[in-house]
Amino acid sequence: MPQNCIAPRPEEDGGVMVQGLPDMSDTQSKSVLAFPTITSQPGLQMSMYPITLKFEEVVYKVKIEQTSQCMGSWKSKEKTILNGITGMVCPGEFLAMLGPSGSGKTTLLSALGGRLSKTFSGKVMYNGQPFSGCIKRRTGFVAQDDVLYPHLTVWETLFFTALLRLPSSLTRDEKAEHVDRVIAELGLNRCTNSMIGGPLFRGISGGEKKRVSIGQEMLINPSLLLLDEPTSGLDSTTAHRIVTTIKRLASGGRTVVTTIHQPSSRIYHMFDKVVLLSEGSPIYYGAASSAVEYFSSLGFSTSLTVNPADLLLDLANGIPPDTQKETSEQEQKTVKETLVSAYEKNISTKLKAELCNAESHSYEYTKAAAKNLKSEQWCTTWWYQFTVLLQRGVRERRFESFNKLRIFQVISVAFLGGLLWWHTPKSHIQDRTALLFFFSVFWGFYPLYNAVFTFPQEKRMLIKERSSGMYRLSSYFMARNVGDLPLELALPTAFVFIIYWMGGLKPDPTTFILSLLVVLYSVLVAQGLGLAFGALLMNIKQATTLASVTTLVFLIAGGYYVQQIPPFIVWLKYLSYSYYCYKLLLGIQYTDDDYYECSKGVWCRVGDFPAIKSMGLNNLWIDVFVMGVMLVGYRLMAYMALHRVKLR
């Protein structure tokens, strides 16, 4: 009977007592399962609630559409991505998934991390239990791409993560100390105060970014750590450093699973276990040190000293070792079928028997810890999440918000407009109404286009952080809205202040303040529509195209260019917030009983001027109310659209 994983139990005081694991020296060569030795290392935080990960017969299929040759009809066909993957990983163990591109490594990792969007067949168990919120909070998932805010420093990135992911029972100073410990553990002391960097400016190196991503997950002291291609795009020395760090984390009692594409020989020998996939089917599972010997026993031995990983990847591609000439597709297919058949015969049956005999789980949470994990859906309160996200957002966008180019753009347009409408006489009512319409158009469309980019640009970050249960969507949404207000309101305020007085509009402080409030009101409505477009489409190109069409329609139906809209399409103007803004600005500047000099010595009633008569200056509170409905409605639409974003 095979040996089972024996877990370290958490002490009552929160420490970890490492119990001896069974000596596998006598059975290692006979058993498919291999078990690690957990060793405490100085400066390395031990896992408090170790997890045994067991997966059995994991099968995942997707439907792909194909065009039929007859009459161009569409037919759906199933493609198998994963085909019966089985294995087990114990605490302190480092499992690597190897295989060529498209073999299903990332899909399997997503299934193990509870992040597969569609259902799959088979069982994935964590200490004998299915995936749950409790397990999710003990799991760290490091994606292949490092999704980080470019304008935050390394310390700020980890500190804000700690504020959101660590429990509220810890003080702010304690969380900061924890961040310092993680930085020291991962060797990030040299770049603590360096910015992450992005496409437009240089920051820390790729290896340091990867360690920051790992550090974000290490802050919660995960029991299960999953990493997708942690060495992708890194040089061999940096890749070795990263994997050495991961190996140290595993030695602290964590269950570590990683996908890796082409490890060096040094890296390969750090793995405890290996799963080798070929077109979604397993062809090897077991100790990394025994893989070459296993394939040699099948007749796939090499006379050269090669990197074991290179040999395994060649076999997964159907290429036998020591092949001098290029193999045909049929030969590759034959090799793959041989290896899959050998796996079923030599490993699969034995592995399933051992998993059946293994205990369902051998770790138990302390009663208090289990109770807390189950009862608390979130580590922090809504208000706390909102304030932290607001602080982070303001700090991240401090360089972008008051961008010199944007300030120059708005101020230059304001001065140019002021010069064009310089002290417009009261008798030139056509020009004065044109200036008011310019207010409604410019500040109806400028914030709309800026807001369209908001959520598509942050989509990857939103998916990453919400997948890990970092915060509520509502707290993020409110923080994002409030954080954008300083720039969204400061620039139009400066704009109106400049052009209002230069244009010679009604020189009354009350009228000026009311006009400014209407413009700011329109800005918030336009921003809401932009957020809704971005959240609905989550694609910058599509969202800007839709925004362009919408702004054109709103411009034409705004009440200035077309004063007598045909009855069958008159409803269009009631959808345009530019129409309501323009009408409110007219109502603030004029009343129906005001008079202007329509020709020399002749005074005409303002209410009879065609452009104003077609708009009407009555019932302005209805327009205020309609814009209020738009302001709230557009944001609700954006919020509901964000709920539809898939987190997996």
From Swiss-Prot:
Keywords: ATP-binding, Cell membrane, Cytokinin signaling pathway, Developmental protein, Glycoprotein, Membrane, Nucleotide-binding, Plant defense, Stress response, Transmembrane, Transmembrane helix, Transport. It is found in: Cell membrane. Disruption phenotype: Weak growth, small inflorescences and rosettes, slender stems, and short and retarded primary root growth leading to dwarf plants. Impaired translocation of trans-zeatin (tZ)-type cytokinins (CK) from roots to shoots (acropetal), thereby affecting the plant growth and development and leading to a reduced cytokinin content in xylem sap. Defective in sterol (e.g. 24-methylene cholesterol and sitosterol) composition. Vascular patterning defects in cotyledons and the floral stem, with a stronger phenotype in plant missing also ABCG9 and ABCG11. Altered responses to oxidative stress (e.g. InterPro entries: AAA+_ATPase, ABC2_TM, ABC_transporter-like_ATP-bd, ABC_transporter-like_CS, ABCG_dom, ABCG_transporters, P-loop_NTPase. It comes from the Eukaryota. Residues 53-304 form the ABC transporter domain. It is a multi-pass membrane protein. Signal peptide: none annotated. GO terms for biological process: cotyledon vascular tissue pattern formation; cytokinin transport; cytokinin-activated signaling pathway; defense response to bacterium; export across plasma membrane; export from cell; response to hydrogen peroxide; stem vascular tissue pattern formation. GO terms for cellular component: plasma membrane. SMART domains: AAA. PROSITE patterns: ABC_TRANSPORTER_1, ABC_TRANSPORTER_2. Its main location: membrane. Pfam families: ABC2_membrane, ABC2_membrane_7, ABC_tran. One of its GO terms (molecular function) is ATP hydrolysis activity. The chain crosses the membrane at residues 405-425, 435-455, 485-505, 512-532, 543-562, 569-591, 620-640. Accumulates primarily in the pericycle and stelar cells of roots. Expressed in leaves, stems, flowers and siliques, and, at low levels, in roots. Accumulates in the phloem. The keyword Hydrolase does not apply. ATP binds at G99, P100, S101, G102, S103, G104, K105, T106. Gene3D superfamilies: P-loop containing nucleotide triphosphate hydrolases. Residues 384-590 form the ABC transmembrane type-2 domain. Glycans are attached at N346. Positive regulator of plant growth which acts as an efflux pump involved in the major root-to-shoot (acropetal) long-distance cytokinin (CK) transport via the xylem sap. Together with ABCG9 and ABCG11, required for vascular development by regulating lipid/sterol homeostasis. Involved in CK-dependent responses to oxidative stress such as hydrogen peroxide H(2)O(2). Forms heterodimers with ABCG11. Belongs to the ABC transporter superfamily. ABCG family. Eye pigment precursor importer (TC 3.A.1.204) subfamily. This is ABC transporter G family member 14.
